[in-house]
């Protein structure tokens, strides 16, 4: 990492090597010390592992699941390069609504750009219930998902809570009231106020981070 007085020599490629293409709002959680090397972390819907580069380099105990076999293979290969001691069975092809882990396994659960692929409210709630089940008391659930916040007049309703966005994609969308109600129903506590990024009026992504308080 670059020292403060050496910022001019800190090249973007060096930062990318250390952190990968990490979600900037997840990066914020790292900066604030909410996800640390001694934690056991699950990336639920890991894709190619882009959010795990730094965690693997820091020797976090990392697990990753995805419904795509190729995604799981790519994430495992990433781990083999960055943290070769990570067991192969930490990388599993699973659906979020049917996780194989024991209750309260993880200190932090990351679920970035996944929940909006829900088929409807029942599917959404099942995925979320599993993420919450495997999160330990005192742990952090970090999610980013598409929402209707800021796009209320630009989306076309389809069915079961799914909408067509201005960018032409179909997504399951939540709003502020749904997220706040769900936080209360889970017995959780917002780690931060809801934050929504409007991407040029084409889609909106909301960061929803929740503490699971000790029982």
Please give the residue ranges for each predicted region:
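Class I (Rossmann-like) S-adenosyl-L-methionine-dependent methyltransferase catalytic domain
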Residues: 1-36, 42, 47-97, 142-215
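A short acidic, Gly/Pro-enriched loop at the edge of an enzyme's catalytic core
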Residues: 97-109
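A short SAM/SAH-binding and catalytic strip from SAM-dependent methyltransferases
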Residues: 108-122
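Non-membrane alpha-helical structural segments and their capping/turn regions in soluble enzymes
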Residues: 69, 121-125
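A short glycine-rich, Lys/Arg-flanked "PGG" loop and its adjoining helix->strand segment in the class I
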Residues: 125-137
């Amino acid at each position: 990492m670059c020292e403060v007085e050496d910022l001019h020599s800190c090249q973007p490629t060096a930062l990318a090597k250390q952190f990968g293409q990490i979600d900037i709002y997840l990066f914020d959680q790292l900066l604030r010390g909410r996800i640390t090397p001694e934690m056991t972390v699950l990336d639920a819907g890991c894709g190619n592992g882009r959010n795990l580069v730094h965690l693997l380099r820091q020797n976090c105990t990392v697990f990753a699941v995805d419904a795509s076999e190729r995604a799981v293979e790519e994430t495992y290969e990433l781990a083999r390069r960055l943290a070769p001691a990570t067991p192969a069975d930490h990388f599993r092809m699973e659906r979020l609504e049917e996780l194989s882990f024991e209750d309260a396994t993880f200190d932090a659960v990351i679920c970035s750009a996944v929940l909006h692929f829900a088929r409807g409210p029942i599917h959404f709630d099942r995925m979320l219930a599993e993420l919450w089940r495997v999160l330990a008391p005192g742990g952090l659930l970090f999610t980013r998902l598409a929402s209707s916040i800021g796009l209320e007049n630009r989306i076309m309703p389809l069915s079961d809570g799914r909408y067509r966005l201005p960018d032409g994609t179909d997504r399951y969308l939540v709003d502020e009231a749904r997220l706040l109600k769900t936080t209360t129903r889970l017995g959780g506590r917002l780690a931060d106020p809801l934050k929504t990024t409007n991407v040029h009026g084409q889609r909106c992504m909301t960061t929803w981070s929740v503490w699971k308080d000790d029982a």
